[in-house]
Amino acid sequence: MGNEEISDFEKQRLANIAERDALLKQLSLNAQSVFTPTLPNRATGSQAKTKKKPAPKKVKKEEESPAPRRMSSRLRGIAADSEVAKRKAEEQHQAYQEAERAKRVRKSDSFSLNDIFVSGQKLSGDGLLGVDVVTKGVAVPYQRTFGDDDIKKTTDKELKALRKEMSELQLWEAWEPNRIKLTPERVYTMTFHPSETKPLIFAGDKMGHLGILDASQEKPTSVKQEDEDEEDDDPDPVLTTLKPHTRTISSMVIHPSKPTHLYTASYDSSIREMDLDKTTSVERYAPDSTSDDVPLSGLDMAADDPNTLYWTTLEGEFGRYDMRTPKQGSVAVWSLSEKKIGGFSLFPTHSHYFATASLDRTMRLWDIRKLSRREPVPVGEHQSRLSVSHAAFNSAGQVATSSYDDSLKLYDFGAKGIASWKPGHTLSDAEMKPDTVVRHNCQTGRWVTILRPQWQINPQSHIQRFCIGNMNRFVDVYSSSGDQLAQLGGDGITAVPAVAVFHRSKNWIAGGTASGKICLWM
């Protein structure tokens, strides 16, 4: 009988006993750790003599309500599987959900920038002023796809001169990119201040932080004392980090006629205005209730109107609001897509036209003058094989889009006479086909911000140009005809500068990475 195999029931019973004993042992150890004080270890003589490094400067964080602490039911005297235990678990889960929900509720109040200050230097008012590509791309870090040989082979003199000029842009020498951490989290959007006297960069991240960097600063030179650590002799750049939003800052704009005002749009459903002179931040637009969740995906302003905001949402909506009027009854909203609109832009010289890029794989051209609230009809649309991430208009009437089919598409509506179109003008499918298609790896994955083209608004020559991040850790510059002008890189770039922006008139280009760090070419 002793050699008989144990039945399945007996095996399960023994396994349950072993599991119970292990659990009781673990609970006993946990209880001992709660009530047993931990004595500090005494350092040996050699360790005690070691020079202590100065403690890092602590950044004052916003006070948060303490999260509910966990304690075992046994220590609380609650029997297992009892109604009290179930009620306790439900209360803990509800408290956690409420805490997470509170973090995401937007801040509707007006406040000074010191109220939303996170780290860095505090600001003062005078301190600032074809055919779709079928194959998927594979990123190869630091492998160039454009360089000096391409410039030498260029036969067009003007194009060759511009390629040489753009390729000679150099990384900011004061600090390497891996030292310039402008935001705590992944950069989602960036912009330059319009000023041509100094490069002033703004960056918004995934958690609602706003970073500000004055790149005209010079690296301080200091005489090292004998008792100073080596780290103290190499300070980081001076920058400022604020937190005006509770969720992702998706877009930002500074109107050239109001250079002291920065407008930011966020997934927390609000648009805020930051006054750089008065160092204040006020809410300019948001839904009536804080419980309304309408994440904003894009923001733009007409070149001839510094008072009207235009935006798009992840719900496929397009909105307009004149800040000089009461919000009640004056906000206009159109539903343009059943799926999210990832990006949009106004035609700078004729702002009643705008282009949208959507998850439904379309780039659509619209005319606000003929936009019906009930059934809005576009001027025309073009469908790609996969979703379209962004549609950017330039002053010549050309639109650049990026798409997950690994292509950049260029549409020349200026050549089709967009400036003279009458209200109600429409384009056929053939007229909406892109004039140029450029192969470009747009497979960003989960941890890299989506690649979006961005035009230089006022280029220094008649050749229009735009920049876009490159998955091989570069920033690419293209002309409106699809010719590559430069591939910018450099030492110290350890991640993809996915968010790339041009200064509106100077040949300054900035790139932001998933770690919140900045690259700057000038």
From Swiss-Prot:
An example molecular function term from Gene Ontology annotations: DNA binding
Superkingdom assignment: Eukaryota
Keywords recorded for this protein, A-Z: DNA damage, DNA-binding, Repeat, WD repeat
Disordered: annotated segments: 34-89, 217-239
Record's compositionally biased regions (Acidic residues): 226-236
Compositionally biased intervals (Basic residues): 49-59
GO biological process, one term: DNA damage response
WD repeat start and end residues: 182-223, 244-284, 294-331, 336-376, 381-422, 445-488, 491-522
Comp. bias (Polar residues): 34-47
One cellular-component annotation, GO: nucleus
Family as reported in the entry's similarity comment: Belongs to the WD repeat DDB2/WDR76 family.
Function: DNA-binding protein that binds to both single- and double-stranded DNA. Binds preferentially to UV-damaged DNA. May be involved in DNA-metabolic processes.
Protein name: DNA damage-binding protein cmr1
Species whose genome carries this gene: Aspergillus oryzae (strain ATCC 42149 / RIB 40) (Yellow koji mold)
